Amino acid sequence: MISTNQFRNGSAIRVDGKRFTILSFQHVKPGKGHAFVRTRLRNMDTGAVIERTFRAGEKVESIRTDSRPMSFLYRDGDLYYFMDQETYEQVAIPEDVVGEAKDFITPNGEVSVLYADGEVVSVQPPAHVELEVVETDPGVRGDTATGGSKPATLETGLVVQVPLFVSVGDRVRVDTRTREYQTRV
């Protein structure tokens, strides 16, 4: 059990029998009345984000989480197979648990797999990944005066907006949090 004054961003807690990750929290002490803590929580199972208010000093159950580095091996149907880099154990993770991370996973690519209560909760890619452009329109000189962009399909199927000078076969760095083009590599 942890008190609301021990909340930290990224902490895992159990509220009403459901597992949540704390996205943000704010201690509020109004002029009248008792202090409280306003939080934004992400449900670990569904991904839904809710707002919840706790009384200051209220205790909630904490969840032990473990993050392990793993390498992506291959995909078979709707299962993604990863190898634990420490024990070399293979783990099959369903596509719905992998979620949006599938757009950034390449063979032998490293990810962080989050376990809560001994089961896989999420797959988190690194902050930036380098992917190859497999399809994009050719950029024509003089198309725009202020620099434009065009859609490009990357090797994982993700479509991002890239500058006109990027062509098929180029490798680009993409920010996995914003899903935006960063630079050509």
Curated annotation (Swiss-Prot):
GO terms, biological process: peptide biosynthetic process
Q: Which GO terms describe its molecular function?
A: translation elongation factor activity
A GO cellular component entry from the record: cytoplasm
Q: Kindly indicate whether the keyword Cytoplasm belongs to this entry.
A: yes
- Report any Pfam family annotated for this entry: EFP_N
Recite the UniProt keywords alphabetically. Cytoplasm, Elongation factor, Protein biosynthesis
Q: Which Gene3D superfamilies match?
A: 2.30.30.30, Nucleic acid-binding proteins (2.40.50.140)
What pathway does this protein act in? Answer: Protein biosynthesis; polypeptide chain elongation
Protein biosynthesis found in the keyword field: yes
InterPro entries associated with the record? Elong-fact-P_C, NA-bd_OB-fold, Rib_uL2_dom2, Transl_elong_fac_P/YeiP, Transl_elong_KOW-like, Transl_elong_P/YeiP_cen, Transl_elong_P/YeiP_CS, Transl_elongation_fac_P
Where located? Answer: Cytoplasm
HAMAP family registered for this protein in UniProt: EF_P
| Role of this protein | Involved in peptide bond synthesis. Stimulates efficient translation and peptide-bond synthesis on native or reconstituted 70S ribosomes in vitro. Probably functions indirectly by altering the affinity of the ribosome for aminoacyl-tRNA, thus increasing their reactivity as acceptors for peptidyl transferase.
This protein's name:
Elongation factor P
**The organism of origin for this protein:** Rubrobacter xylanophilus (strain DSM 9941 / JCM 11954 / NBRC 16129 / PRD-1)
Q: Which gene encodes it?
A: efp
